[in-house]
Amino acid sequence: MSRRNRAPRRDVPPDPKYGSRLVTMLIRKLMMRGKASLAARILYEALDIVRERTGQDPLPLLENAVRNATPLVEVKARRVGGATYQVPVEVRGERGTSLALRWLVTFSRTRPGRTMAAKLANELIDAANETGSAIRRREEVHRMAEANKAFAHYRY
């Protein structure tokens, strides 16, 4: 165990264009090598593509996509006696959102396509429609937790 104090949670400021904390969180997940303005430009472009394709406000669609990709349970490794068990645990809200955003960005990067904005827009639309790689990943995590339900009594 670490002897140091835990770092306090930093509050996430809302982004300037949409006034949404979720958008800021997604910009930060997209960002590579500290290039926040580039990440913001990519996300805003992706949201414009979403608006163009669906003909509706992209913010509720983004919230819906994140909600659909958020896992409710996950498995954590727990050593008991010489064996390591995959113990299902509930996911706290903030971690669930963080995982969903991470999966959306990761699977957007692996998608075939021309620009990152287009790939992200496609992944968001797919997640909002409950398809796509991020949703598949959530289902996989849920299946793992369901399969290891027998070890739930080892919970932390």
Curated annotation (Swiss-Prot):
Q: Does the keyword Ribosomal protein apply?
A: yes
Report the domain of life of the source organism.
Bacteria
**Name of a matching Pfam family:** Ribosomal_S7
A Gene Ontology molecular function term for this protein is: rRNA binding
Q: Which keywords has UniProt assigned to this entry?
A: Ribonucleoprotein, Ribosomal protein, RNA-binding, rRNA-binding, tRNA-binding
UniProt GO cellular component terms: small ribosomal subunit
Entry keyword Lipid biosynthesis: no
Give GO BP annotations, semicolon-separated: translation
Q: Which SUPFAM superfamilies match?
A: Ribosomal protein S7
Role description: One of the primary rRNA binding proteins, it binds directly to 16S rRNA where it nucleates assembly of the head domain of the 30S subunit. Is located at the subunit interface close to the decoding center, probably blocks exit of the E-site tRNA.
Q: How does it assemble?
A: Part of the 30S ribosomal subunit. Contacts proteins S9 and S11.
According to its UniProt record, which protein family does this protein belong to?
A: Belongs to the universal ribosomal protein uS7 family.
Q: Protein name, please?
A: Small ribosomal subunit protein uS7
What gene makes this protein? rpsG
